[in-house]
Amino acid sequence: MVGITCNVADDKGHTASASTNVTIVEPPPPPAPKTQALCSISFATDKKRPTRVDNEAKAFLDEVALDLQRQADAKAVVVGESTDAERAITAKQEKVAAKHKKAVVEQFAAQRGLNAKDYLVTEKGIDASRVSVATGSTDGQTVEDYLVPAGATFSSDVAGTTPVDETTVKVEVRKPLAERHPAHKKAAAAK
């Protein structure tokens, strides 16, 4: 509390005085930072390679990389999603893998997220420790990207996600198309 007193006088010799007490209240603290949803990337267009990062996905991930470069203390979380049909395939493959050690188990949601992270790290130069991968429970062939500012907690802001053990899922290596044999080119040109 602060006491304030005012005294005034005019040119005719009149005076006046007033006093008051003012309570100064501290302003409320700023709201805690929250996780921001950035974009949703669809992987439904390529039926043969449903976890591949295509050019459309790269455009979205380029924006994510720019956001991370603008906010050096922020992190990103990439949440891969899969369809019910893909989850059924994974469950079936896991049963086979329990009996056969060399059996392959496709984890579509984790693979999508890991491929998106790999693009951010290898192509855009984002530090791998700033990008986390998780899987979600939404039905779809998508990846949801989130920006987590310093002081925010992803797990409390976004429910229904599970962190991915990146040692159990491998990044899908991009393979260039095989070069066509010259005889095939001539046959195609002759038609």
Residues covered by each model-derived region:
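Short acidic, S/G/P-rich loop/turn micro-motifs used as interaction or catalytic elements
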Residues: 83-88
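Short helix-coil junctions and helix-kink-helix linkers
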Residues: 95-107
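Cysteine-centered nucleophilic/redox motifs
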Residues: 78, 109-121
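Trihelical helix-turn-helix/Myb-like DNA-binding core that engages the DNA major groove
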Residues: 117-120, 127, 131
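Short, conserved glycine- and acidic-residue-centered signature motifs
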Residues: 54-57, 105-109, 113
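Periplasmic peptidoglycan-binding/tethering modules of Gram-negative envelope proteins
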Residues: 1-76, 89-98, 126-129, 136-191
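A beta-strand-dominated structural motif
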Residues: 109, 133-135
